[in-house]
Amino acid sequence: HCQIEAVELDLLAAQQAQENFKASPWHNRLHLTHQDVQTYCQQTAHQFDLIVANPPYFAQGVECKNDERALARYVQQSHLDWLNWAASCLSEKGKISFVLPYEAGKTLINSTALYCIKQTDVITKIGKDPQRMLLTFSRENLPQVKDSLVIYDENNQYTEAFIALTKAFYLKM
């Protein structure tokens, strides 16, 4: 059985995650460290088979109501730095998956020494350009899989693909 290690910089988000962990049927396999990713990766001896993340990805913009919100939304480090720190914690065959804005994802794919083995372009509505990119990187040069995910159809209803992907996680699906 796998063990899941979460790393969260924001104290309130870490506390909420800890509460959620306690309520989980897998609570004994969930562990949380309140720390930034760079420090965690520099200090840990763990080598992970899979790292899944949603790092902050907005450039500084509209002022947030509080510092916690700004920390969660706005980029503090470059995406390439973040990826490199996480890669230092990867096992030999490990993978890193995360979400980025579409253009930032294209830039990262071209900037890293890791191989992008999966790219899913996320399209909010049929007929629109992709807004986000789900990416998976590996040290191994594996065949790349490219696909897309459309969230809403032309009638503003969730697509079958989106429902199939998220129904286990959304309460009102």
What do these predicted ranges mean?
Residues 55-81:
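Mobile active-site "lid"/loop adjacent to the S-adenosyl-L-methionine
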Residues 59, 104, 141:
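Feature marks short, surface-exposed loop/turn motifs that line or immediately flank catalytic pockets
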Residues 77-130, 134-136:
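Conserved Class I SAM-dependent methyltransferase catalytic core
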Residues 128-173:
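SAM/dcSAM-binding transferase cores
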